[in-house]
Amino acid sequence: PDSGLIEEFIEDYPYSPFPQMQYTERPDRFCAGLSEGLVGIIVDGSPMALLAPGNLASFFQSPEDYYERFPYGGPLRALRYVAGVIALVFPALYVAISLFHQEMLPTKLALAIAGSHVPVPFPVLVEALLMEVALELIRESSVRLPDPVGQTMGFVGALLLGDAAVSAGLVSPIMVIVVAVTGLASFTIPHYPTGLAIRLLRFLLLFSSAWLGLFGLMAGLMAIALHLGALTSFGVPYLEPLMKPRPSLRDVVWRSPVFTFNKRPEYPEPLDQVRQKKFIRTWAPGVAEMARKESGEGGGGDGEDGEDRGKSGDGAR
């Protein structure tokens, strides 16, 4: 049996489009999850391992965030969240504005969009569906081919298909740009099942936007938010790291420096909350003297660490 079969048997909400467990084939990510207090599941004969419980924030994290310095890893992770919103909302937002809310656009942009739709015989919704389905076909066909051929086939096929569709007057150039940006944004999501969920919900938002405009789009987003708020993974709320202001938030949307990760995340409820001691740069000018003064006045840093270690020891006992 594969780990995906085990996941369907033990997850809390099997009918939800959102995954509730992390799955990975990278040893570094698996070991990092174990060190944070997560439970790892390895199936004999399967290259994929499971980590539980899962939450929405963990699906936007990549091991490369920690291998780069935090001035680079932090913005890249924040960019992934922005790309996830674009991949979910951008086509539906374009359809809603084009059909119902043209007054929101500048005059020149509104005239350009209206002029690009003149030779197209289909409504905006049909245009978006045609391009989205074509993009999904190219993506699935490239996955089934060998890696070098599949990547080349994906890029070349998308370029040729978009150019041919515009030349034939089946879609507008602006729609090709919207779908292309959406496809690029969806590729930035590191967790594949989360990307699949966003791709599925994008079609639902397209229909709601074509029906009620921005009101339909907001209703769809509110339904998704309510669903995410009701989800749990082994009893842990799906939005747990984002619901409460905790110290672990420094590693959710933005990756802070590694030397500030003194505590483990709270939601797995690990027995030992202390991940590492408070880091002091004793070799830096003036820092060693300041640390000695603090320790002489009452051992602020050591006392705090000792208290944390005592609490963690009591929890373990």
What spans do the regions from the language model cover?
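Cytosolic regulatory modules rich in charged/polar residues
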Residues: 1-127, 233-252, 257-260, 270-281, ...
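Active-site proximal loops enriched in glycine and acidic residues that flank catalytic Cys/His/Asp
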Residues: 43-45, 124, 147-149, 170, ...
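Transmembrane alpha-helical segments that form the functional core of multipass membrane systems
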Residues: 55-205
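Generic detector of intrinsically disordered, low-complexity, polar/charged segments
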Residues: 147, 159, 166, 210, ...
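Hydrophobic alpha-helical transmembrane segments of membrane transport and translocation systems
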Residues: 175, 180-298
